């Protein structure tokens, strides 16, 4: 008579029946034993899963629990995850939609072993690997689909890209899968005969994967033909690839950690913009880049809005990760990372130290793509904050998803924070700033020093600012730019054809209230490693994320706004509403500056003095819209001729702003302006301790020569304007012929930044000094406020014997 168990077993479908141990093949008997060690042997074949990790996963559950018990939620979950990770057999049709997104693995299995040369594909010539470098752990790079020819069969491409010729390749390929099984087994708590049934299914899965690996090894030769070897960085001469997906996997394993296997890392998609910072992470035209950061178990699952198949694939993977971490958020929206996505593996309840952590962002190639790819205009902001070398340091990563969905602010043991998305203004563009803190001496993952990627000693910043969707209406639109803080901060304009960096202070002040709402200005200041960040403070607090930064110093009014790329345009600091800081720290609008402000600043400051010049002649130039003004500069009345745009404003003593064409000045800058006429005395502030008229260019001016001071806009603009000094012959002394960009200062105001100046100087003047640091519009105004009165001024005490000639004149005030 049959037992109850046998009878109930017969009632079950064939696949659900319990197969007696005696009827199983010899290779299946071992895993079905109730012993923990034997139960876990089923996953021992997976090279990426060391025995200790596997056994630990098996012992978490009571007797009878199997590694596959976590899959009792449904076999579909296991298969969906396998599909999401693209570990399905090559014959499976479900691998076709994701054929171009399967990463090929090249990694060493253990964290302590040295890294062998990695094979890379032909990437865009500006592509660079950026990753953690404070530890000599294992680093791997996954760049498969660029290697696959466009005409390759999708299934064949998927298999070829996943195949590995060596055992380490296979290990790293299945490492995530094996770890997932182990972790899911550790979460299993329900013993019973179903465990044995699912163990049986696990064995079938293992056999399928083993068979798959054999086929992949045979096809590996095809892939090797498309691989090109590089010392670690794609050379600039590499031809740009076709539009395909790029995968980069950067993982770090500190030597002092006991992590034995890398947790599963889900691919993350980035759509690069064409106007990336040139000397940092720059991605090619229309290709996609998938960044995988597996540092100490950190997983990042982003939002992908391109394909339905990929979307569902990632959704399944996210669900699997939620199960893996023991946390289910059934109601959460796709794209809003859960604590499982944000946090480290919580198995040990202790986060592993690692150099830095990052969040990923979905960025579309161009602003026009936003409407087609993401109608709701979803954006993401990313900031990677540095982590100190000590495990106790608090590292926090903010991700602001400008989505109106209800987000969740999570804070787990790893110190990761998900910032609440601010309500975005649909007319504004997103911004992404990624900052790391590699020192020049720290080796990067590919073995190159930090200086190979970043110029100077500034902390590396991967910055991206998308194109402005809302046109700026003033002449010489202020291009978006990125400030890299450091000992000598860099201002990097983004989106401009002239990608040149000019020295600037790490503070940005928008030139007028009109632009205060434009979120294209970023200030990234170096943050203390131990400082705790509140993500809500960094994320936009209002509808206009004008500035996302750690801190901004308004009193330090350094002009970081560069003028328009077109030379004939004027700098924005003349715009009505621009803030100028006086020597006493007072802030005034540019249109409110008075002569007393200049005199008071010169009296208060020990470094500034007022230079003056008298207009002697105003003539039309051969070029349209340009006037030639002749000045008598200083007490020696050195003759200087300057070519200036007719709308360029100068500050006249006792009168205020004046220009050759007040109508155009008012039209462009909305700045109240008077007509500049012969006899007007233009004043500006200059530095006493400068020997050369230009701090930046270092003009060779003798003590008897005049001070050539350029407008702040000129210095900041990157010296786009050429100024030539010619001796007028009226005075004694030799005149120097100078051709410098934005370096000259004119007595009226600061030099005209947008138009070339021809200055005829009588070098009978004392050594000229130019204030280069006042390049900012606000700072320039400060300079002007400190300008010394000209010879004609009734304040001779301010005019030393060696009065310097400031040809810039009004450009200082124009700030």
Curated annotation (Swiss-Prot):
Tissue expr: Widely expressed throughout the body.
Record keywords, A-Z: Cytoplasm, DNA-binding, Isopeptide bond, Neurodegeneration, Nucleus, Phosphoprotein, Repressor, RNA-binding, Spinocerebellar ataxia, Transcription, Transcription regulation, Ubl conjugation
Region (Self-association): 494-604
Residue spans of biased composition, Basic and acidic residues class: 1-41
Compartments (UniProt record): Cytoplasm; Nucleus
GO molecular function, one term: identical protein binding
Region (RNA-binding): 540-766
The organism of origin for this protein: Homo sapiens (Human)
Modified residues (Phosphoserine): 82, 88, 238, 253, 775
Name of the protein in its database record: Ataxin-1
Residue span of motif Nuclear localization signal: 794-797
Biased composition (Gly residues): 49-61
Transmembrane segments: none
Region (Interaction with USP7): 538-815
Subunit structure: Homooligomer. Interacts with CIC. Interacts with ANP32A, PQBP1, UBQLN4, ATXN1L and USP7. Directly interacts with RBPJ; this interaction is disrupted in the presence of Notch intracellular domain. Competes with ATXN1L for RBPJ-binding. Found in a complex with CIC and ATXN1L.
């Amino acid at each position: 008579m049959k037992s109850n168990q046998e009878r109930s077993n017969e009632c079950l479908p064939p696949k659900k029946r319990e197969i007696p141990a005696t009827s199983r093949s010899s290779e299946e008997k071992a895993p079905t034993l109730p012993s923990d060690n034997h139960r876990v042997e089923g996953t021992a074949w997976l090279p990426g899963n060391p025995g200790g990790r596997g056994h630990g996963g098996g012992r978490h559950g009571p007797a009878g629990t199997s590694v596959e018990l976590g899959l009792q939620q449904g076999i579909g979950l296991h298969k969906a995850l396998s599909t999401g990770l693209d570990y399905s057999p090559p014959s499976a049709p479900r691998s076709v939609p994701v054929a171009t997104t399967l990463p090929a693995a090249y990694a060493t299995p253990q964290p302590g072993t040295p890294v062998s040369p990695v094979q890379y594909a032909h990437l865009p010539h500006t592509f660079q690997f950026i990753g953690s470098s404070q530890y000599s752990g294992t680093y791997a790079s996954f760049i498969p689909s660029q290697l696959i020819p466009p005409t390759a069969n999708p299934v064949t491409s998927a298999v070829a890209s996943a195949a590995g010729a060596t055992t380490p390749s296979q290990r790293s390929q299945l490492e995530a899968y094996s770890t997932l099984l182990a972790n899911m087994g550790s979460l299993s708590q329900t013993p019973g005969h179903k465990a044995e049934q699912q163990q049986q299914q696990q064995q079938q899965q293992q056999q399928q994967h083993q068979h798959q690996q054999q086929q992949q090894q045979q096809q590996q030769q095809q892939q090797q033909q498309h691989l090109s070897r590089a010392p670690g960085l794609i050379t600039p001469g590499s031809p740009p690839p076709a539009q395909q997906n790029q995968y980069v996997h950067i993982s770090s394993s500190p030597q002092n950690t006991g992590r034995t296997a890398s947790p599963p890392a889900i691919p993350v998609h980035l759509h690069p913009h064409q106007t990336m910072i040139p000397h940092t992470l720059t991605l090619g035209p229309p290709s996609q880049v998938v960044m995988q950061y597996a540092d100490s178990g950190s997983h990042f699952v982003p939002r992908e809005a391109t394909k339905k198949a990929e979307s569902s694939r990632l959704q399944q993977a996210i669900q699997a990760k939620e199960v893996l971490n023991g946390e289910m958020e059934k109601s959460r929206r796709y794209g809003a990372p859960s604590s499982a996505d944000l946090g480290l593996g919580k198995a040990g309840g202790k986060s592993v130290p690692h150099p830095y952590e990052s969040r990923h962002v979905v960025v579309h190639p161009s602003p026009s793509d936003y409407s087609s790819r993401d109608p709701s205009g979803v954006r993401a902001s990313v900031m990677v904050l540095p982590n100190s070398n000590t495990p106790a340091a608090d590292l926090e990563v903010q991700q602001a998803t400008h989505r109106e969905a209800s987000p969740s602010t999570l804070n787990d043991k790893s110190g990761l924070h998900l910032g609440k998305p601010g309500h975005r203004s649909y007319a504004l563009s997103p911004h992404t700033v990624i900052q790391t803190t590699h020192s020049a001496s720290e080796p990067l993952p590919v073995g190159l020093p930090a200086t190979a990627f970043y110029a100077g000693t500034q902390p590396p910043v991967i910055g991206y600012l998308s194109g402005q969707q809302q046109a700026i209406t003033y002449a010489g639109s202020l291009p978006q730019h990125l400030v890299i803080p450091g000992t000598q901060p860099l201002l990097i304009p983004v989106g401009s054809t002239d990608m040149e960096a000019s020295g600037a202070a790490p503070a940005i002040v928008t030139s007028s209230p009109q632009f205060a709402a434009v979120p294209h200005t970023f200030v990234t200041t170096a943050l203390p490693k131990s400082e705790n960040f509140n993500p809500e403070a960094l994320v936009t607090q209002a509808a206009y994320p004008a500035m996302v930064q750690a801190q901004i110093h308004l009193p330090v009014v350094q002009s970081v706004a560069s003028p328009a790329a077109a030379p004939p345009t004027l700098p924005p600091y003349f715009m009505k509403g621009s803030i100028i800081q006086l020597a006493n720290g007072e802030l005034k609008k540019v249109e409110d500056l008075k002569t007393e402000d200049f005199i008071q600043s010169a009296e208060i400051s020990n470094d500034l003095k007022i230079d003056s010049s008298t207009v002697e002649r105003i003539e039309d130039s051969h070029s349209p819209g340009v006037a030639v003004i002749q000045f008598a500069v200083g007490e020696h009345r050195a003759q200087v001729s300057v070519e200036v745009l007719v709308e360029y404003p100068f500050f006249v003593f006792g009168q205020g702003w004046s220009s050759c064409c007040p109508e155009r000045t008012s039209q462009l800058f909305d700045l109240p302006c008077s007509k500049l006429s012969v006899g007007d005395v233009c004043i500006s502030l200059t530095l006493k301790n400068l020997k050369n008229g230009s701090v930046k260019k270092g003009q060779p001016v003798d003590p008897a020569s005049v001070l050539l001071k350029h407008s702040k806009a000129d210095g900041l603009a990157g010296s786009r304007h050429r100024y030539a000094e010619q001796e007028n012959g009226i005075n004694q002394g030799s005149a120097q012929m100078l051709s410098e960009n934005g370096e000259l200062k004119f007595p009226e105001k600061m030099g005209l930044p947008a138009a070339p100046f021809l200055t005829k100087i009588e070098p009978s003047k004392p050594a000229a000094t130019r204030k280069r640091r006042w390049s900012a519009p606000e700072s320039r105004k400060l300079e002007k406020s400190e300008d010394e009165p000209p010879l004609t001024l009734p304040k001779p005490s301010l005019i030393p014997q060696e009065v310097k000639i400031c040809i810039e004149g009004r450009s200082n005030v124009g700030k």
